[in-house]
Amino acid sequence: LFLTSRSQPAFLLIGFNAGANDYVTKPFDTSEFLARIRTLLHMKRSVRERLDIEMAFIQAQIKPHFLYNTLNTIASLSEVDPDRTRDLLADFGSYLQSSFDLRNLDQEVPFEKEWTLVQSYLNIEKARFGSRIQLTTEVPDEAEFVLPPLTIQPIVENAVRHGVLKKIEGGHIHISVEEIGDYAWISVRDTGEGIPPLKREAILDGTYRLGIGLVNVNRRLKNTYGQGLLIDSVEGTGTLIRFRVPLKQNKEAER
């Protein structure tokens, strides 16, 4: 909220570009000024509540059968490979902890935190499906930026569940992170069944109703950065899903 003695569009535009959401012209009435402040605070609370509900909904989508199957895998391994069982239990614990972390609902999280969740998820799935999931990564050790929570993992899960595991022989998943100009580009490529054109369009325009993973990620990226997912897919061949995170904002936050 900003105060101004000028109401011409050009001057108001300067204020809005600087981050203001509303304005009051001078001289102003105190009751009007306080009413507008209350309205803006109410809007802020409403946005936070919506984020809380949205993230709770995302977390509720963790499929019960995934939990059951993971526990069954751990139980089976415990009889033949105790060391691997311990590792898988650690991955499972890390996965659950990251998936249900409610402390950063309306914030961005370090890439390292999101990457730990992805690795835990993939370790669990590889323990279950073995060589059907072939994985390669190009993720630099020095990758340091922030992004919305639960952003990469749903894309990777889509590559596993609706990509390579749709083929009897499985397939390959490649995850890369690359800094290009002012952006960090995150890419997930798979050699799975591909996404039909109509489904791809429905995911990107938010009308797809059979699953919320990619739809939700795309919407949150648009709300945060102004650009969502880029999806290239060929049926029967595979899918490439990419998105970018501005590094400039990250570097300014560090200062």
Report each predicted region and the residues it spans.
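Two-component histidine phosphotransfer core
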Residues: T25, R38-I62, F66-L230
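Short, conserved "switch-loop" micro-motifs in signal-transduction and mechanochemical regulators
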Residues: R6-S7, L40
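C-terminal output helix
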Residues: A10-F11, P27-I37
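Alpha4-beta5-alpha5 "output face"
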Residues: Q8, L13-N17
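Glycine-rich GHKL/ HATPase_c ATP-binding element in histidine kinases
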Residues: G171, T237-T239
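A short beta-strand-to-loop motif within the catalytic HATPase_c
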Residues: I231-E235
